């Protein structure tokens, strides 16, 4: 299957540069897989499409201020470092820009020496292994010196950093937000629970695997970068109960989908687990857990668009994207949402 098949043209003005004042005022396109019907509404009306006994599974990861700007020692060259994956205390996989001149042993100073990074090794995806030296607590140092790692297509500074977090973000570790969850408010979550719809959380720390561009010509040749995830026994039991009652398990986002499908050892049999996943879901994949998916509108030729196409069918998804462009939906991280049933 060719990567080109997942390309589409998007007018630049449809890339959402900032979030709406109210999270749940986003538009919502609803795709019904069985009938091919498409409905249009707003996100706060999502309850109308859910039934008592259904279960929403959300990702409670929290974005860390993973973008660091420093100076190479002793030249003073400006260096940007993006934290990707914690290996051990103070040792991280990172992306470095400009990267070509960053060799083993090179040092970078951040915040006038409050944090110093030393290149220890190279990674197989063009990144570096960096050892950090600092006093005190690493998280606190990063909170002070780091910036939120907004995607490159967001060119305006986001005034409220909290808007790039879900309202239920708890576990630090992501370098990008699980964007499907950005549409939920505390009030909407409360209303959903009051309707008898279940809500439960798992964790997948969003890393390079989620947003890394596909450079291969053929979809099958792309390799995902692994991301850490946790699916608890409670999640497994709640999903099992939901399935036994004939109700729907709805994944809030592609990250939840990948975590659940990674934990499915066989059809409809989930296992509690924690670890790393490099699962790559594209058309032809046989879904084992989810019955519905809430997601945003994704970049052309991205692994996220491929996952959505695997779930709803490529033709239906590409038709829905055409309609979204025609009706001027807002795209990408701060954009509108889609519910696939």
From Swiss-Prot:
GO terms for molecular function: S-adenosylmethionine:tRNA ribosyltransferase-isomerase activity. Pathway: tRNA modification; tRNA-queuosine biosynthesis. GO terms for biological process: queuosine biosynthetic process; tRNA wobble guanine modification. It catalyses: 7-aminomethyl-7-carbaguanosine(34) in tRNA + S-adenosyl-L-methionine = epoxyqueuosine(34) in tRNA + adenine + L-methionine + 2 H(+). Keywords: Cytoplasm, Queuosine biosynthesis, S-adenosyl-L-methionine, Transferase. InterPro entries: QueA, QueA_dom1, QueA_dom2, QueA_sf. It is found in: Cytoplasm. Transfers and isomerizes the ribose moiety from AdoMet to the 7-aminomethyl group of 7-deazaguanine (preQ1-tRNA) to give epoxyqueuosine (oQ-tRNA). Belongs to the QueA family. This is S-adenosylmethionine:tRNA ribosyltransferase-isomerase. It comes from Halothermothrix orenii (strain H 168 / OCM 544 / DSM 9562). The gene is queA.
